[in-house]
């Protein structure tokens, strides 16, 4: 059976490279196996979820090349969660509790002070009907906890191998808040069961949560999916990534000029047994994805690696991929092929191409470091048409006429022709600059 997977972000902020990682793992897993990828927007937190962030998530995934086969919003599915909660209440697995957060905190501190684990003591299960009525009369509304079965919860994880969590070490989780709204846990299980999710691929910070959800799946009589808990992406210093790090948001990285392929390559291959390298498309990354090869150690994200991957993708980008973007920069189609061949090895971001086109087409302000050399070089410019051999034959003639060689010859010519002391090989740029513009620049004119 083809797998069905999902990515379930909360639309409370922009996606960053850290939560792009599970999105990519799921999308690539589905792509490799011919399965389906579902985007589920966990927007039940109405105070923090916004339509703008929801739209941004869809846009950012599209930038990475991920287009969901189906998109769902939890806010449209409340009736399903209500029905599931009623089933759990009827089965005695969901029970009301009336403690305030302050009362729970005091109880937790007492347990810690006595050297006990801070696990909820199920005091609510011992309340009499009269005690519950008294709480209701004073205005308290219950939150609802899921009663965990005792003993170990086990599963075979596609990343971590055999896993088990002792349910006795966990507090009965709150599934429904006092106002009737749902926390993440129950809606996630209900959706996974109703949609037919076969594999849940997510960060290792969900391992304990998985034990709880497995019990909820079983309590609802639903099939338990296969789980895979990958390592988390951190900063180079080991700090966890968060939505507060705006420069690492996908749109922040996009605005800085990074290619989606560079971001995807780093997000997927970091922290695995695969060498981190630039993979230009998702099909190539899907072929490399093997969850069994994902490390259990933290995956450290180094921006320097992203710079290198970005440059590599640009240096190897074929003209067919670059041509529409060159046209968008205003570069004529007739010049696109020779221009791209000349400059791509010097690009850190694609937008750098616009700067090199200004060097070619002008106006560029020349720097005349050696007026005598510039004048002699102008006089020796050969007639057009020019090609990639023109630079060599021309500079050999200038060398013979002036006796200059090496840096003393080439740097003044580069400064005069481009106004810069560095850049692409002039054998590729000179034919694009052209004879008339080259002559004017060698005379010190902006052209």
Swiss-Prot record:
- InterPro entries in alphabetical order: aa-tRNA-synth_I_cd-bd, aa-tRNA-synth_I_codon-bd_sub2, aa-tRNA-synth_I_CS, aa_tRNA-synth_I_cd-bd_sf, Glu-tRNA-ligase_bac/mito, Glu/Gln-tRNA-synth, Glu/Gln-tRNA-synth_Ib_cat-dom, GluQ/Sye
Tell me the subunit arrangement. Monomer.
> Which ranges belong to the motif 'HIGH' region?
9-19
- Biological processes per GO annotation: glutamyl-tRNA aminoacylation
Give the catalysed reaction(s), semicolon-separated: tRNA(Glu) + L-glutamate + ATP = L-glutamyl-tRNA(Glu) + AMP + diphosphate
Q: Where in the cell is it found?
A: Cytoplasm
What NCBIfam families does the annotation carry? gltX_bact
Question: Gene behind this chain?
Answer: gltX2
Annotated SUPFAM superfamilies? An anticodon-binding domain of class I aminoacyl-tRNA synthetases, Nucleotidylyl transferase
Give the first-level EC class, as a single word.
Answer: ligase
The organism encoding this protein is Methylobacterium sp. (strain 4-46)
Protein's recorded name: Glutamate--tRNA ligase 2
Q: What is the annotated role of this protein in its UniProt record?
A: Catalyzes the attachment of glutamate to tRNA(Glu) in a two-step reaction: glutamate is first activated by ATP to form Glu-AMP and then transferred to the acceptor end of tRNA(Glu).
């Amino acid at each position: 059976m083809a797998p069905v997977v999902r990515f379930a972000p909360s639309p409370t902020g922009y996606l960053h490279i850290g939560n792009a990682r599970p999105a990519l793992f799921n999308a690539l897993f589905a792509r490799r196996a011919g399965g389906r990828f579902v985007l589920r927007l966990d927007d039940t937190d109405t105070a923090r979820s916004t339509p703008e962030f929801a739209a941004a998530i869809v846009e950012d995934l599209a930038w990475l090349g991920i287009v969901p086969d189906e998109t769902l919003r939890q806010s449209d599915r409340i009736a399903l969660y209500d029905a599931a909660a009623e089933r759990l209440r009827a089965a005695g697995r969901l029970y009301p509790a009336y403690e305030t957060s302050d009362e729970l905190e005091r109880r937790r501190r007492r347990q810690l002070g006595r050297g006990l684990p801070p696990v909820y003591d199920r005091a609510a299960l011992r309340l009499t009907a009269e005690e519950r009525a008294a709480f209701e009369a004073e205005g308290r509304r219950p939150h609802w906890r899921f009663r965990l079965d005792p003993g170990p919860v086990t599963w075979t994880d596609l990343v971590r191998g055999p896993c088990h969590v002792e349910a006795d070490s966990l507090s009965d989780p709150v599934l429904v808040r006092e106002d009737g709204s749902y926390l993440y846990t129950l809606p996630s299980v209900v959706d996974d069961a109703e949609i037919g999710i076969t594999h849940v691929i997510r960060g290792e910070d969900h391992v304990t949560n998985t034990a709880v959800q497995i019990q909820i799946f079983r309590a609802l009589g639903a099939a338990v999916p296969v789980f895979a808990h990958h390592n988390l992406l951190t900063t180079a210093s080991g700090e966890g990534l968060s939505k507060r790090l705006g420069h690492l948001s996908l749109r922040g990285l996009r605005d800085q000029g990074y290619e989606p392929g560079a971001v995807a390559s780093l997000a997927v291959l970091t922290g695995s047994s695969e060498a981190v390298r630039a993979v230009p498309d998702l099909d190539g990354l899907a072929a490399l994805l093997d969850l069994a090869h994902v490390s259990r150690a933290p995956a450290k994200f180094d921006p320097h690696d992203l710079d290198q991957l970005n440059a590599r993708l640009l240096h190897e980008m074929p003209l067919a991929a670059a041509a529409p973007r060159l046209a968008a920069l205003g570069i004529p189609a007739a010049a696109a092929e020779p221009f791209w061949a000349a400059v791509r090895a010097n690009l850190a971001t694609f937008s750098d191409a616009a700067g090199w086109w200004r060097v070619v087409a002008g106006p560029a302000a020349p720097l005349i470091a050696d007026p005598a050399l510039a004048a002699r070089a102008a006089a020796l410019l050969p007639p057009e048409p020019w090609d990639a051999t023109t630079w060599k034959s021309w500079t050999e003639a200038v060398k013979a006429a002036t006796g200059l060689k090496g840096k003393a010859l080439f740097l003044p010519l580069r400064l005069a022709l481009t106004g810069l002391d560095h850049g692409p090989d002039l054998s590729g740029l000179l034919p694009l600059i052209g004879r008339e513009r080259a002559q004017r620049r060698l005379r010190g004119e902006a052209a």
